[in-house]
Amino acid sequence: MIRFSVFLFAIGVAALAPAIASAQSTPAPAAPAASPSPSPAPNPIGPAFGANDPCTSISAIVTRPSVTNSVCTVRPNHVEIETGYQNVTFDGGGNAVTYPQALIRVGLPIPALEFDVAPPQISRASAGGVTTTGSTDVGAGLKYVFGYTPKFNYGGQVFFTAPTGTNGVSAGGTTASYALNAGYTLSPVFSLAGTATAQSQTNGTQRWSALASSLVLGVALPNATGLNAEIAQFSHAIGPGTPTRTQYLLAVYRDLGPRIQLDTSFAVSPTTATGKYHYVGFGASFYF
């Protein structure tokens, strides 16, 4: 009996030996490591300055073709160039064309501050069979965003011109503009923006103060497209003591990617005392 029991024990050990060896030599498989989530791609416009920063898209930064200035500034170490063409037809006859309507905006190292330069533009006017071509005055200024909330943003800018123009296109002296800009988001589709600008104007022999004010309704449409409808007024529009001019503008813009925007516009002034006119324009803006 003892030998038979030993024999059975030996058989049992022999049968279990492979399983025991396998358990000792093969560790349990480790749980797979979680793959890290990919980091978001950097914004091509530049990083936001805060949780409610509205200035993170080209449509928020471009300031043409409306009279109303955009509140937003170009990000530090970036440059934006705006260009355009405008063709004005006057009610009593005559025509004026201006191009390339260039504005160079440079983001400075100080956050929310930019430096602006307006090179001379070509201006061609035709009236009574006579055509005159000249260049406009050069200008420069600074623009700054004062602050923002989830719905409201505001800022200001200063701009000065020097009498560098030719062939009667120049103002004939230095001019200065001091503007306050503001914007308010009504909904994901609708927004309001406005600008109030105090101006020191001249015609070379006289100097006077004027005020330009504007209000624009913005409509965000599908496919990176938007619509702007604006009313603007200009006091002492053509000289000291002259009436206020009113202008209505309708513009459509389309973003071609995050750094290019195209626009087209139509405007009309019905003010007889300052000369009725209407114009068409188009432009392009590039962010680098």
List where the protein language model places each region.
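Transmembrane beta-barrel domains of Gram-negative outer membranes and organellar outer membranes
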Residues: 24-288
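Sec/Tat signal peptide C-region and signal peptidase I cleavage site
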Residues: 19-23
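Bacterial N-terminal signal peptides
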Residues: 5-17
